[in-house]
Swiss-Prot record:
Membrane topology note: Multi-pass membrane protein
Keywords (A to Z) from UniProt: Golgi apparatus, Membrane, Sugar transport, Transmembrane, Transmembrane helix, Transport
Cellular component, GO annotation: Golgi apparatus; Golgi membrane
GO molecular function: antiporter activity; GDP-fucose transmembrane transporter activity
Name of the protein this chain belongs to: GDP-fucose transporter 1
Chief site of localization: Golgi
Similarity annotation: Belongs to the TPT transporter family. SLC35C subfamily.
PANTHER family: SOLUTE CARRIER FAMILY 35
Cell compartments where the protein resides: Golgi apparatus membrane
Biological role stated in the UniProt entry: Antiporter specific for GDP-l-fucose and depending on the concomitant reverse transport of GMP. Involved in GDP-fucose import from the cytoplasm into the Golgi lumen.
Gene Ontology biological process terms from the UniProt entry: GDP-fucose import into Golgi lumen
Region (Disordered): 345-364
């Protein structure tokens, strides 16, 4: 295998497994006092939780509120992408006009770069669209279970694309997640609240999340490794690609007939949803920066648990013991997978390389 193939294989492996270089994190942790770093981590994690949970509840309102009655999920997603593009361009202009005010890269739409990002944009559209469609057809309480197969797809794609085998214990945690998913589907059906359409969209969203991680790593060099440039091009491409979908699905006609089209409250909620969509990318990166990818996964799992409890309380739903068991299986399996992968990566890092051993033996 040549150097280029090895590099591509490493990139795909990092994308699927969520690994990163721990040396930078270790150095950063040594620079600041423990109390200050702990406070920063607590604030960043809290910001991530508030932003993520608020975005889910707000999107549920926009997509499936009885008081709103807006049946245009593609338009809602399109508008959120448009808000992100405008925010990126606005921050870029501010950074250019007032240096030092905000740290943001200069953004200029380059069609060549846009074409390079296009494969990722197609996957990105699938990810955010299927996410919103899943949320439209299922309750917030079941939303995490409906989208719980991302880890399973990560393992599957790592084998299909990298021929990377997974340890027995990691596969065991995946089987717990799958078991929790099917138990959740069964219990939703028993309670008469199951939407097979929403469940299918959740599975497709999970697949797209895994593919998005792969393509993000592959496309980053085209935007000089800048996440903000990638966000700008990704959402700009999405806005263009959404237009034929809006026409084909008749959502523009439905929007023109919407009674609250001229309501300031409606557009305020739509814009707020776009702001949360923009912010979640930033706070996710911030949480990974101040902790690690593995800690981010643990935080996401705990956040999902809190979100489920809040949804049940807010919507005043009564859930069976087996329904809660399915959620605990999904969350527990996800946490266990993160823990197993963390131990395996730590063990791999601690093991000396064969060539180093040979060299030391020769020196002796």
């Amino acid at each position: 295998m040549n150097r280029a193939s090895l590099k591509r294989s490493k990139i795909l492996h990092m994308a699927l497994m969520g690994t990163s270089d721990p040396s930078g994190e270790a150095e950063a942790s040594q620079e600041k006092p423990f109390v200050l770093r702990a406070l920063q981590i607590a604030l960043v994690v809290s910001l991530y939780w508030v932003t993520s949970i608020s975005m889910v509840f707000l999107n549920k309102y926009l997509l499936d509120s009885p008081s709103l009655r807006l049946d245009t999920p593609i338009f809602v997603t399109f508008y959120q992408c448009l808000v992100t593009v405008l925010l990126c361009k606005g921050l870029s202009s501010l950074a250019t006009c007032c240096p030092g005010t905000v740290d943001f890269p200069a953004l200029h739409l380059d069609l060549k770069v846009a074409r390079s990002v296009l494969p990722l944009s197609v996957v990105f559209i699938g990810m955010i669209t299927f996410n919103n469609l899943c949320l439209k057809y299922v309750g917030v309480a079941f939303y995490n279970v409906g989208r719980s197969l991302t880890t399973v797809f990560n393992v599957l794609l790592s084998y299909l694309l990298l021929k990377q085998t997974t340890s027995f214990y990691a596969l065991l945690t995946c089987s717990v997640i799958i078991g929790g998913f099917w138990l959740g589907v069964d219990q939703e059906g028993a309670e008469g609240t199951l939407s097979w359409t929403g469940t299918l969209f959740g599975v497709l969203a999970s697949l797209c999340v895994s593919l998005n991680a792969i393509y993000t790593k592959k496309v980053l060099p085209a935007v000089d490794g800048s996440i903000w440039r990638l966000t700008f091009y990704n959402n700009a491409n999405a806005c263009v690609l959404f237009l034929p979908l809006l026409l084909a699905l008749g959502e523009l006609r439905a929007l023109l007939a919407f009674p609250q089209l001229g309501s300031a409250h409606f557009w305020a909620m739509m814009t707020l949803g776009g702001l949360f969509g923009f912010a979640i990318g930033y706070v996710t990166g911030l949480q990974i920066k101040f902790t690690s990818p593995l800690t981010h996964n643990v935080s996401g799992t705990a956040k999902a648990c809190a979100q489920t409890v809040l949804a049940v309380l807010y919507y005043e739903e009564a859930k069976s013991f087996l329904w809660w068991t399915s959620n605990m299986m999904v969350l527990g399996g996800s946490s266990a997978y993160t823990w197993v992968r963390g131990r395996e990566m730590k063990k791999t890092q601690e093991e000396p390389h064969p060539r180093e051993n040979e060299k030391s033996n020769m020196e002796v």
